[in-house]
Curated annotation (Swiss-Prot):
Coiled-coil regions listed in the entry: none
Broad EC category: oxidoreductase
Protein name as it appears in the record: Biphenyl-2,3-diol 1,2-dioxygenase 2
Native organism: Rhodococcus globerulus
Entry-linked SUPFAM superfamilies: Glyoxalase/Bleomycin resistance protein/Dihydroxybiphenyl dioxygenase
Length: 190
């Protein structure tokens, strides 16, 4: 095989059609490309749609964290400042992350949509994929690949105090500033 596909979109089946449409448009700063016949196509970039909603004619069972299936979708921002801007914007609208995690390789905020699906907003903590891969093959990541919880409220304070971004985006900083937060794996799987 010589052709490599690129990811196009995710389709979510829902009985909370309007709430899901509005949530994804808000969280991803996206817009509806098409809506009708129980379908909604949403995009935030050059692709004609990145998220699609399939409206169920009857009420669906709630998300079951104990069932097999996709756990979350993830969306990357260019800078910590961009991620913080989105965090602050969403917070002002009453949308707060359920699980902030310093993975080491990424700094991530996990939200839950109205159906309970996780959506990760993140930044890469390394400049290149090779650097990220090297970190993932190193001892810190090998010892704790999920990472540690942190309080995103503390990041703007740290930046204002002159703490470098490459320090804030580490396990060590998260553990120093918020040592008593619960294991993020529990929140991600419940």
């Amino acid at each position: 095989m010589t052709a490599t596909p690129k990811f196009a979109h995710v389709v979510l089946q829902t009985s909370r059609f309007e709430a899901m449409r509005d949530w994804y448009c808000t969280v991803l700063d996206a817009h509806v490309v098409y809506e009708g016949h129980g379908l909604c196509f949403i995009t935030f970039d050059e692709e004609h749609h990145r998220v699609a909603l399939l409206g169920a004619p009857t009420a669906l069972e709630p998300r079951n964290p104990g069932a097999a299936g996709m756990h979350h979708t993830a969306y990357t921002f260019d800078t910590l400042g961009d991620l913080l801007d989105r965090y602050e914007s969403l917070k002002s609208k009453g949308i707060e992350p359920k699980v902030p995690i310093q993975h080491g390789v990424t700094t991530s905020l996990y939200y839950q949509d109205p159906d309970g699906n996780f959506v990760e907003l993140q930044i890469d903590n390394f400049s290149t994929p090779d650097e990220a891969t090297a970190y993932m093959n190193g001892p810190e990541y090998g010892g704790n690949p999920v990472g540690v919880s942190f309080d995103p409220v503390l990041i703007p304070q740290a930046l204002s105090a002159g703490t470098p971004v490459d320090r804030i985006t580490t396990h060590a900083w998260a553990l120093e500033t918020t040592p008593d937060l619960p294991n993020p794996m529990i929140a991600l799987t419940s």
